[in-house]
Amino acid sequence: MQLRPYQQAAVDAVYNHLRDRDDNPCVVIPTAGGKTPCMATICKDAVTLWQGRVLVLAHVKELLQQTADKLTAVCPEVDFGIYSAGLKRRDTNNAVIIAGIQSIYKRACELDRFDLIIVDEAHLISFDGEGMYQQFLADAKKVNPHLRIIGFTATPFRL
């Protein structure tokens, strides 16, 4: 799958950010602008170029299935699994795992180390340090202190 120029620019900006800075980037692409192909490209590169392990977090099973379908289309050679009660799958040993936050948020220490976590709909991460995403990300950083996190959203600001 060929990314559109603005999608490729977003992916390139993520790589530059991860290389040049220690904090975690947030990618803002409008609704229906193609966030999922960008995420799939990053997953593919993380596994094939950097031998990393990736977790993609989403909050509803429809997004999990959409991401799994796109990942298969973009990079069928990547070993990926799904961890979601709603989809009745609990894959844990894959290079890329697509997971529902409700199914996984108390299990960071049970899973093997991740090098990269991608959060779809990142605007759902609480600012106050509480909530499922914050709990999971804090626990995942205990497992791998060098963990990098990339957020994706169409709506980075809350009213």
Regions found by a protein language model. Name each.
Residues D20-D22, T92-N93, K106-L116:
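Short basic/glycine-enriched coil/helix segment immediately N-terminal to the Walker B
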Residues I101-Q102, C109-R158:
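SF2 helicase catalytic motif II
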